[in-house]
Curated annotation (Swiss-Prot):
Keyword Cytoplasm among record annotations: no
Organism: Xanthomonas campestris pv. campestris (strain B100)
The name this protein goes by in its record: Large ribosomal subunit protein uL11
Annotated CDD domains: Ribosomal_L11 (cd00349)
Top-level division of the source organism's lineage: Bacteria
GO terms for cellular component: cytosolic large ribosomal subunit
Protein family membership: Belongs to the universal ribosomal protein uL11 family.
Coiled coil: none
Signal peptide: none
Length: 142
């Protein structure tokens, strides 16, 4: 018989840097889950990623206090800011441009995000990422 799901917990944790401090500790602790077990498993799963990149994770908590988790790819906004070399997006993206990204950079980001995007082709994924870039106040070249 399948285990009963009691909660879905969505967090953004830095790759390879999960620890019992907030947001991980309180979110798992109130569900009675083993915090250190999650931290070790998450850090092992994200060891191939660049340390410190925010990584969305969806934790499924079961009634017997066990859990499973799925890691997603880093948010497009974080990858775009890194590619453009800016610390934050524009407060007024239509009038104030804060940086530039090239078509090649968009393609690289689209390849990283491919599994999480609903786009059927790479070209559609690139257009999606380009739209995100424009909404952040980045100029798309190429």
């Amino acid at each position: 018989m399948a285990k009963k799901v009691v909660a879905l917990i969505k967090l953004q944790v830095k790759a390879g840097q999960a620890n019992p401090a907030p947001p991980v500790g309180p979110a798992l602790g109130q569900r009675g889950l083993n915090i250190m077990e999650f931290c070790k498993a998450f850090n092992a799963a994200t060891s191939k990623l660049e340390p410190g990149l925010p990584t969305p994770v969806i934790i499924t908590a079961y009634s017997d206090r066990t859990f499973t988790f799925i890691t997603k790819s880093t948010p497009a906004s974080v990858l775009l800011k890194k590619a453009a070399g800016v610390s934050s997006g524009s407060k007024r993206p239509n009038t104030d441009k804060v940086g530039k990204v090239t078509r090649k950079q968009l393609e690289e980001i689209a390849k990283v995000k491919e599994a999480d995007l609903t786009a059927a082709e790479l070209e559609a994924a690139v257009r999606t990422i380009a739209g995100s870039a424009r909404s952040m106040g980045l100029t798309v070249e190429g």
